[in-house]
């Protein structure tokens, strides 16, 4: 069992008429694919309803995380000195917020991606090739991810916000590995 009893209770005992808990057979990547498919095809929803995600695919969460970087950096002496952050990450959301904070002028010396055996981000940063590998279950299940959704947001920025180029890259990724030019 990958979910502790405490985690199970946190997920299943939330009270509220608008909250519906679902369990799936699969891993984080499988669940994330279902969520993305639901956002792409909302025909199952009544016309007056919409879907909202509170995980890192929601832009509002990324914006809130940017604030954490500024707060921590100021506490560490910024802007008079540069700061570095080491961030455990699987889905790239929190570290992407750090990247955006640096783009906004925060004096970030470096952002360090901390990962586990499911090291998709380490591999892409080291080889400029984005490819899937089999998922390995570890003691850090929130990092047990083979496709980092928010990495696509970084690519969008690095490719000068060219949505067509990113759509083509991600379509190619659906079929296999992708390699990046100098960006």
Which residues does each predicted region cover?
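PLP-dependent amino-acid enzyme catalytic core
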Residues: 1-183
């Amino acid at each position: 069992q990958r979910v502790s009893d405490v985690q199970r209770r946190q997920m299943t005992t939330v009270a509220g008429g608008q909250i519906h808990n679902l369990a799936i057979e699969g891993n984080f990547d499988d669940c994330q694919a279902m969520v993305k498919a639901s956002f792409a095809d909302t025909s199952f929803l009544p016309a007056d309803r919409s879907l909202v995600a509170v995980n890192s695919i929601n832009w509002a969460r990324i914006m809130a995380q940017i604030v954490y970087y500024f707060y921590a950096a100021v506490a560490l002496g910024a802007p008079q000195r540069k700061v570095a952050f080491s961030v455990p990450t699987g889905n790239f959301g929190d570290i992407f917020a750090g990247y955006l904070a640096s783009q906004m002028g925060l004096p970030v010396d470096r952002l360090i991606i901390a990962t586990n055996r499911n090291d998709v981000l380490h591999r892409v940063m080291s080889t400029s090739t984005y490819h899937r590998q089999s998922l390995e279950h570890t003691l850090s299940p929130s990092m047990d991810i083979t496709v980092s959704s928010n990495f696509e947001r970084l690519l969008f920025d690095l490719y000068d916000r060219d949505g067509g180029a990113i759509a083509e890259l991600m379509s190619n990724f659906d079929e296999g590995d992708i390699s990046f030019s100098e960006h």
